[in-house]
Regions:
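Repeated scaffold domains used in trafficking and secretory/extracellular systems
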Residues: 62-66, 115-123, 162-171, 207-218, ...
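C-terminal motif of bacterial Sec signal peptides marking the signal peptidase cleavage site
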Residues: 15-18
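Short coil/turn segments that connect the beta-strands within blades of beta-propeller domains
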Residues: 71-73, 126-128, 171-172, 219-221, ...
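An edge-strand/N-cap motif at the start of beta-rich repeat modules
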Residues: 44-106
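Surface loop/turn motifs at the tips and blade-to-blade linkers of beta-strand repeat domains
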Residues: 109-115, 157-161, 202-207, 261-266, ...
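Short loop/turn segments that connect beta-strands within beta-propeller blades
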Residues: 99-103, 148-152, 192-196, 252-256, ...
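Residue position within the beta-strands of beta-propeller blades
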Residues: 74-80, 131-133, 175-178, 222-226, ...
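Structural motif
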Residues: 82-96, 138-145, 183-190, 231-249, ...
Length: 392
């Protein structure tokens, strides 16, 4: 096959997996296999002649722990087949909240969604509202919806051709990582609930991909992972290294102040989350969409990276640390297994616990921890939206 054909194929794969940190997980039976392998050495990648790495500033580690008065809630997003067997009758978004006391998942929201939607979502527990991406059956793009969990009232808040990758509700404000109409890349945006409009980080920028959008409670800023769409398409990246040079940064709520924390093109970073004052955890692959997805630990001050393997786990797809700095919730694949499950892991004792659902999900989509003035106990039952109406 000619080199130009190879490059074209790789570019198509990159565009399809550009937001791969949030790829949904099919749950095959034990006979299936979702393992990917690679015999290429990612550490051999070298910067192109004349290419400069971004200069990283001196990093001041924030002092003190986040507000302990906030309620920490683990939310897990799944998509299930409505008929229980296949997608012929459509799919539904199901949001689970995990109760630590009873050690059980509880459904707090369920609704049919469009077949082509990535169902990014978040919950405002104080006002009992779910915000989520969905679409009408004939649409191949996303829009933002809200559902009042007290009344079941649903509102469509936007009317455009969007692609949502993340939704966050922080300090009473709704944030999104979204690619708007006529744009390729996702970028952070703040949503005004009164005017129902987005304020984007930089509307003129359709080159910078923003991945792994999360709120860093230690820095009181957002943690973001960025790379260049143009650089992703270069011969060096698409045909030689197969690694997108990426930068982990902090960005404040105004989107005006950005602090780079770490840069690499030695391996592919998929997802990042702050563990404690001086540590960031990240899932990585040797190259783009190649090899097992494993966990690494970054020391922010020293810039040293080390493996953070979890005994008994062969892949960590997505994760969220607790504010206690010791507990890790993640979607992973146990050694010798092909099923993806949700686990809780204690870093100090290495105690690993599988969290079980009332019914096994068809696809696990996302895992998120929120910190708000109240949690699921504030809700009055769960909200189930169906064609014939609302059931409480």
């Amino acid at each position: 096959m000619k080199a130009k054909q190879l490059i074209s194929i790789l570019l198509m794969l990159l565009l399809l997996t550009a937001c791969s940190a949030n790829t949904d997980l099919d749950l095959p039976d034990e006979a299936g296999s979702s393992e990917q392998t690679s015999n290429m050495d990612a550490s051999a990648a070298e910067p192109e002649d004349g290419a400069e790495k971004p200069t990283l500033p001196e990093i001041e580690t924030p002092e003190g722990a986040p507000d302990a008065e906030l309620v920490e809630t683990l939310l897990v997003t799944v998509v299930d087949n409505i008929n229980g067997e296949n997608t012929d009758d459509g799919v539904e978004l199901v949001i689970y909240a995990y109760d630590e006391q009873s050690q059980a998942f509880r459904v707090i929201f369920k609704t049919p969604i469009g077949p082509y939607v990535y169902p990014a979502n978040t919950v405002d527990f104080e006002h009992q509202i779910v915000y989520y991406a969905s679409a009408r059956p004939d649409e191949t793009y996303d829009n933002l919806y809200s559902c009042d969990l007290k009344t079941g009232n649903v509102q469509r808040l936007t009317d455009g051709k969007n692609a949502f990758n993340d939704l966050l509700f922080v300090d009473g404000t709704l944030y999104a990582n979204v690619a708007r109409e006529f744009c390729t890349t996702c970028q952070p945006a703040r949503f005004d609930l009164d005017s129902q409009t987005f304020t984007y980080r930089n509307e003129a920028d359709d080159d910078t991909w923003h991945h792994s959008f999360s709120y860093d409670d230690y820095a009181d800023e957002f943690l973001i992972l960025t790379c260049s769409d143009a650089e992703m398409r270069t011969h060096r990246v698409a045909a030689e290294t197969h690694i997108r040079p990426k930068t982990i940064s902090l960005i404040d709520a105004t989107f005006e102040n950005v602090t780079p924390l770490f840069f690499t093109e030695d391996f592919e970073i998929c997802l990042t989350r702050r563990l404690n004052e001086n540590t960031i955890l990240m899932t990585t692959e040797p190259q783009m969409v190649s090899g097992k997805r494993t966990l690494k630990r970054l020391d922010i001050t020293s810039q040293e990276v080390e493996n953070a393997a979890i005994p008994g786990i062969q892949q960590v797809h997505m994760f969220y640390p607790s504010l206690d700095g010791n507990t890790l919730y993640f979607v992973g694949q146990a050694e010798g297994k092909t099923i993806w499950n949700v686990y809780r892991y204690a870093l100090d004792t290495q105690e690993l616990t599988q969290l079980t659902f009332p019914k096994q999900p068809d696809r696990i989509i996302d895992i998120q921890i929120t910190h708000q003035p109240c949690g699921p106990d504030f809700l009055h039952g769960c909200c189930v939206l169906e064609d014939e109406g609302l059931k409480k």
